[in-house]
A protein has these predicted regions:
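Short, conserved recognition motifs on repeat-domain binding surfaces
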Residues: 1-179
Length: 179
């Protein structure tokens, strides 16, 4: 059980859990708009993190970090001047630093007028081979991209059909999708 700590300042909370193989330590990250904390299982203590200068915003996407290549990744949603934008930011567990934004796939929609009027569903997760992001919209187009190691994004799946809104949990063996 983790030692108690106050909820970080700033509303929407994000969190993640992962193994730092360089330091041989399990780490937990908890953050909000203005404060972020890390817990080391090895030391049994929490400490405040620095290094993410601007507030972090989550409007719709789940707040759980996805572990990929030794870093936790989150989808970040921002609202500016009537539109929403989406980016991926990450936290390197070994260096204990927030990283530059990871580019999304070229065809992944990056701005929206409204989550609701655009009929939007997007998310991110990890599979055995890497990170994946998905998108579906009012046209009933559903697309999944995967990223392995340092390479670019590859479109894994693209299909049009009636979707009733769900979050993709993972893949089955052989690349067959399990909604």
């Amino acid at each position: 059980m983790l030692p108690q700590r106050d909820t970080p300042r700033g509303g929407w909370t994000f969190y993640g859990f992962g193994y730092d193989s360089a330091g041989e330590d399990y780490k937990v990250i908890v953050g909000a708009l203005y404060e972020r904390y890390i817990h080391s299982v090895k030391t049994g203590s929490w400490r405040k993190l620095e290094g993410l200068d601007e507030p972090v915003h989550f409007q719709i996407q789940g707040n759980i970090g996805c572990l990929f290549n030794g870093a936790l990744h989150w989808l970040e949603f921002k609202q500016e001047e009537g539109t929403y934008s989406v980016e991926i930011f990450s936290f390197d567990l070994a260096e204990e630093e927030f990283q530059a934004v990871l580019p999304l796939p070229t065809r992944f929609p990056k701005t929206y007028r409204s989550w609701y009027s655009d009929g939007l569903g997007i998310g991110m997760g990890t599979s055995r081979t890497g990170l994946f992001v998905y998108h579906y919209d009012h046209t009933n187009a559903f697309t999944i991209w995967t990223k392995e190691d340092e390479g670019g994004w590859s479109e894994l799946y693209n299909h049009s059909r009636e979707w009733c809104g769900f979050d993709l949990l993972g893949f089955q063996e052989g690349g067959v999708i399990s909604p």
